[in-house]
Curated annotation (Swiss-Prot):
The keyword Cell division applies. Coiled coil: none annotated. This is Baculoviral IAP repeat-containing protein 5.1. BIR repeats lie at residues 27-97. It comes from the Eukaryota. The gene is birc5.1.
């Protein structure tokens, strides 16, 4: 029953963790164990510049996720260009459309960018959020029915 809740909590945690990833150095630091380090296009530096964060799993050591659009890519090859792969698979990513460094944005520009990042999160995880809300509503309804049944010593038929 709580699988949607767990996925929702994990997704929100990722959204919060990634708010610091506007900083190139923070993104780069996630690539400490990246399998491609030299003589290739997908070096840690190039991956971080393209907005990626290294999110390895036990079975997939080369998973990279854009901190902005949350697009996850795996199966990297040495000749894969991070910018090209990112734009092919997430052309509407707000990070890709930046024309200047985040530090050079006005406060208004940065807030608009952050609002776009949060919208991307909700687009990606809206079904998880909806499932979580539905599960919580069902559980709350059940608790209320049990409470009122016990208070008034009657049974309530939900199928009517």
């Amino acid at each position: 029953m709580h699988s949607a809740k767990n996925r929702f909590v994990q997704a929100v945690q990722r959204l919060q963790d990634f708010r610091n990833m506007y900083d190139y150095e923070a993104r780069l630091a996630t690539f400490a164990d990246w399998p491609f380090t030299e003589n290739c296009k997908c070096t840690p530096e190039n991956m971080a510049k393209a907005g990626f964060v290294h999110c390895p799993t036990e079975n997939e050591p080369d998973v990279a996720c854009c901190f902005f659009c949350l697009k996850e890519l795996e199966g990297w090859e040495p000749d894969d260009d991070p910018w090209t792969e990112h734009s092919k698979r997430s052309a509407s990513c707000g990070f890709l459309s930046l024309t200047k460094c985040v530090n050079d944005l006005t406060m208004e520009g940065f807030l608009r960018l952050e609002a776009d990042r949060i919208k991307s999160f909700y687009r990606k995880f809206s079904t998880v959020v909806l499932q979580y809300v539905e599960e919580e509503m069902t559980a709350t309804t059940k608790r209320l029915l049990e409470y009122f049944s016990n208070q008034h010593q009657c049974s309530i038929d939900l199928d009517r």
